[in-house]
A protein has these predicted regions:
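Helix-loop boundary and gating motifs at the non-cytosolic
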Residues: 2-49, 206-245
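Hydrophobic core of transmembrane alpha-helices in multi-pass small-molecule transporters
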Residues: 14, 95-113, 215, 295-309
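Helix-to-loop junctions at the C-terminal end of transmembrane segments
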Residues: 55-68, 154, 256-268, 353-354
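Cytoplasmic helix-loop-helix junction between adjacent transmembrane helices
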Residues: 103-138
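Loop-to-transmembrane helix entry/capping segments in MFS-fold secondary transporters
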Residues: 38-39, 126-138, 239-240, 322-334
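Structural signature of the two symmetry-related core transmembrane helices
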Residues: 73-87, 271-286, 366
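Symmetry-related core transmembrane helices of the 12-TM Major Facilitator Superfamily/SLC fold
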Residues: 162-178, 361-379
Length: 389
């Protein structure tokens, strides 16, 4: 049976989201196990999130301008250090050593993301068939499976099972990246206009408004994800139930992602982005009203109309809103909002939780989500607005 580029891209997405599960899904569990408090966890996550937010557009712009640096080379340059860190982590004790290592995993994982998405368009522009929705759905399915496994293993053997799991996943991921072929018709690097990077956001005002909406969506998303363990513990749960909750929210993404191609035939990406913003607000409100771990399990179903829609719609929205010559830069700006959302969500959530408690954190989270809806609506209303350059 011939292994197509589409099959390999599915493997790439699947293994990438398993790597993402190792770092972002279990950061609170790992750092709590190493002895850090909520505010310290938030500060660590925020610091490395800031670095990722700065690196993503920078590396995206360099890749767009370079004829030698490709998305594939950039992924390898980030994935190999990820593997090395996972190997070293179990052998280096100490709370802050663990914090630095886990922070670096978050930095590397977030910085890889725009290049994973760019690979889709690289092959598509060269005439290769890529089913992004199915590939991203496989990513969610494998994220769910790994979340269950790590949750059980961490409860039984301790938190060092988090980086140990990362070793195997990173090895497989690097192997798949090496096996991703070059296309017969490489995508040409478009000529760059002097001063292009400086004026990027000014030239795409509707896109910039949507970036602000995404920042707020991902802030509320990261408040809930980063402190999901603490939310579950406040309701009497443990790390095993954290794994179940993470698995549920990943599994319910799969039908939406698998069927995303059909959704695109009926709705514009910008409409789906607005719907996702409303979904994030609904999820935030329901979390604020939750009273049991079982309710948390039920609320995770709202992932279908929030992050699941966002995960694919943001990629296609960027492709639609941004000129071809700026695609990698545009994707990098979009995915940098995930890193920036990690910063705001982890930092604000950690300090509010430490100083004012769970109820205050979840209430502020609702306000942030509603502001995200407002900016998404403003962007959709101004979609035709462009600056002449």
């Amino acid at each position: 049976m011939k292994i197509t580029i589409n099959n390999r891209y599915m493997a790439l997405q699947g293994l990438f989201w398993m790597l993402f599960c190792v770092s972002s899904g279990f950061i609170s569990l790992y750092l709590q196990g190493r002895g850090l408090g909520n505010a310290e966890i938030g500060t660590v996550t925020a610091f490395f999130g800031i670095l990722a937010a700065l690196l993503q557009p920078l590396l995206g712009g360099i890749t767009d301008r370079s004829s030698r640096l490709t998305w594939r080379n950039m992924i390898l340059m980030l994935a190999i250090p990820y593997l090395v860190i996972c190997i070293v982590m179990p052998f280096v004790p100490g709370a802050w050593a663990g914090a630095v290592f886990m922070g670096l995993l978050i930095l590397l994982g977030n910085t890889m993301m725009p290049f994973i998405n760019s690979a889709n368009f690289y092959y598509s522009y060269a005439g290769e068939y890529i089913n992004f929705g199915v590939a991203r759905g496989i990513g969610s399915g494998l994220y769910a499976l790994l979340a269950l496994v790590i949750g059980v293993l961490a409860e039984k053997f301790g938190v060092e099972m988090v980086p140990i799991s990362g070793i195997l996943i990173a090895l497989l991921f690097i192997l798949v990246v090496f096996r991703m072929p070059s296309t017969k018709e490489p995508v040409e690097k478009a000529p760059r206009v002097k001063g292009l990077e400086k004026g990027f956001l000014l030239r795409y005002p509707a896109f910039t408004l949507m970036l602000l909406a995404c920042l707020l969506m991902l802030t509320t998303h990261n408040i809930l994800n980063t402190y999901l363990l603490q939310i579950i513990q406040s309701l009497g749960g443990n790390s095993s139930q954290l794994g179940i909750a993470l698995a549920i929210q990943a599994v319910v993404e799969v039908p939406v992602l698998f069927g995303f191609t059909k959704l695109l035939k009926r709705f514009r990406p910008r409409t789906l982005m607005l719907t996702a913003a409303i979904g994030f607000a609904l999820k935030a409100l329901m979390y604020a009203l939750s009273s049991s771990v079982f309710m948390i399990y039920l609320i995770q179903v709202t992932q279908m109309i929030s992050f699941a829609l966002f995960a694919s719609a943001s990629v296609f929205y960027t492709s639609e809103a941004i000129a071809k010559k700026d695609q990698t830069t545009g994707q990098a700006y979009m995915t940098s909002m995930m890193a920036a959302g990690t910063v705001l969500g982890s930092l604000s959530g950690g300090w509010i939780l430490e100083l004012s408690g769970m109820k205050a954190m979840l209430s502020v989270n609702v306000i942030i989500a509603l502001l995200g809806v407002c900016f998404a609506f403003m962007s959709v209303r101004n979609i035709g607005l462009r600056r002449k350059v």
